[in-house]
Amino acid sequence: MANTTFSGPIRSENGFKNISKTASTGVIHDRTFGTSPKDARRAYLEENFLQRPGINANIDQVSTVEVQRALNRNFETLGTNYTTALTTFAVTGAGILMTTATADQDQGILLPHLDTAATAWAGTLWGTENSVHFETSLQIPALDNQKVWTGLKLTNDQLVATDDDQMFFKYQTDATNSEAFTDFTKWHFVHSIGGTDYISVLPITVATNTPYHFKIEVDSDRKAAIFVNGIQYNVTTTAGSTGGTAVTTGTTKTAALTDDVDLIPYVGIENGAAAAEAVNVHFLACSRSVYE
């Protein structure tokens, strides 16, 4: 592609996209982060983890305590047997590495600091009626005995059946302490509308140490579109809390989500055996209309 020089401002009615093309396959990827350029009709929050998130008890210590002073003010961590020390800055990638403890079903979960008035991440409502956009990038160092999930949920639980309204991506190696999937090698997209669950099996076989850029975009009709590494995928209309329906690339969105439901952004990992598992989170971002 040739370089072009402009002497005046570049104008586009619907924004710009950062596009790349895989030479071997010809597949086009939208590598845009957020909305480009940013739109004055939307509010944006972006977390690049300049500080490590810690558990709530450490964040709430008086600021004369060295551990508290070093921790992230916007995000915290929690989970079964999780401690602040289990979150480190990633050595081989950007962002943070969350590593579970070593007992079966130990967890590491990342979420906004939910104490009252602690951060705009929790004070801002990510409602289904707010045209919310969610995105994060993560990678997994190993693919054994684990469950990884990220998206917008009512609670931090990884089970499909827990939340009546939700939108999240999930990978799990087995059904232990979880629901049965038809294919445990693939990324899945789970969404629930008023207690009815839908599981889309994406044609993406999970690989180790591979960055996955997940994006969920809810439009003004409360319908969600999903993207992985800049490629849009269809969302199934077949209801079910187990198994899953295979989908392909395409533009089919969810049906209209339940109106006026405020969701919380999460990233989580749970081990499925007596061994530590980890997830590397590069960044997390959300935006919404400035007024519903």
Label each region the model flagged.
Residues 98-186:
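Secretory/extracellular carbohydrate-interaction modules
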Residues 227-231:
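Short strand-turn-strand beta-turns centered on an Asx-Gly dipeptide
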Residues 190-213:
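Short, aromatic/His-centered strand-loop micro-motif at the edge of beta-sheets
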Residues 246-292:
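Ligand-recognition surfaces built from glycine- and aromatic
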Residues 134-136, 210-219, 224-226:
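Short tryptophan-centered beta-strand motifs in secreted/extracellular beta-sheet-rich domains
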Residues 49, 136, 282-286:
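Extracellular beta-strand elements of beta-rich domains used
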